[in-house]
UniProtKB/Swiss-Prot annotation:
HAMAP family: MinC (MF_00267)
Subunit annotation: Interacts with MinD and FtsZ.
Gene Ontology terms describing biological process: cell morphogenesis; division septum assembly; regulation of cell division; regulation of cell septum assembly
Protein name, entry field: Probable septum site-determining protein MinC
Transmembrane residue ranges: none
NCBIfam families xref list: minC
Family: Belongs to the MinC family.
Alphabetical list of InterPro entries matching this protein: CAP/MinC_C, MinC, MinC_C_sf, MinC_N, Septum_form_inhib_MinC_C
Organism: Thermoanaerobacter pseudethanolicus (strain ATCC 33223 / 39E)
Function comment: Cell division inhibitor that blocks the formation of polar Z ring septums. Rapidly oscillates between the poles of the cell to destabilize FtsZ filaments that have formed before they mature into polar Z rings. Prevents FtsZ polymerization.
Highest taxon of the lineage: Bacteria
Keywords from the named record: Cell cycle, Cell division, Septation
Pfam family for this entry, one: MinC_N
Length: 214
């Protein structure tokens, strides 16, 4: 039995599939194909990097895996670190370490009360986030509408993540493990604002003050 044989992570280099130690490549091939079949839109246009944590996996088998994925789905696959003795894991520090980095998901429509939209990358909401709605991203969050619910950016621990909204009236803001209370009613603004972590606290500034934050 393979325990967590496949881990899919979003990083600066795109989607990364991590293959665990002592794996059966045929079983992995089947599992990867099944994962892609279940989430075709998620993988559409993506670049896949396969990181191998075991040198027991033969290179020709990995090439076969690349060929199968490319022939079936047109997805380019890169094999990384195959010849290295010590394979470096993808860590949270590698994931979305800046405002301009990382893969992005676009969610079209209103996020309603009780609804959760979560993504291991940057997340753009084209619509509003209603009270009781929750949006979570490993990277940055941009709401092209009114943010009235809860937004949690950098949920993997990235304090460099930001939250941006056309109108920021959130019930709660979270960046990594830092939490901010809802703004007072009189403080709510109708112009775009950005929330960042500074000195261990979340601060909110007008978006046109962006250059003052760095």
């Amino acid at each position: 039995m393979i325990k967590e044989a496949i881990k899919i992570q979003g990083t600066k280099e795109g989607l990364v599939i991590v293959l665990e130690e002592d794996v059966d490549i045929e079983t992995l091939k089947e599992k990867i194909v099944n994962r892609i079949e279940k989430s075709l839109k998620f993988f559409e246009g993506a670049t896949l990097t396969v990181r191998v944590k075991s040198l027991s996996v033969k290179e020709e088998k990995l090439q076969e895996l690349k060929d199968v994925i490319f022939e079936k789905y047109g997805i380019e696959v890169r094999i990384k670190n195959f010849q290295e003795k010590h394979i470096k894991n993808v860590t949270d520090d590698e994931i979305f370490n800046g405002l301009e980095e990382g893969i992005t998901k676009f969610h079209k429509g209103t996020v309603r009360s009780g609804q959760v939209v979560k993504y291991h990358g940057n997340l753009v909401i084209i619509g509003d986030v209603n009270p009781g709605g929750l949006v979570q991203a490993a990277g940055n969050i941009v709401v092209m509408g009114t943010l009235r619910g809860i937004a949690h950016a950098g949920f993997t621990g990235n304090k460099e993540a930001v939250i941006v909204a056309s109108s920021l009236r959130a019930m709660q803001l979270r960046i990594a493990n830092v939490i901010s209370r809802a703004p007072d009613k009189d403080d709510a603004s109708d112009y775009p604002e950005i929330a960042v972590v500074k000195k261990g606290k979340i601060i909110v500034k007008p978006l046109y003050h962006l250059n003052d934050l760095w």
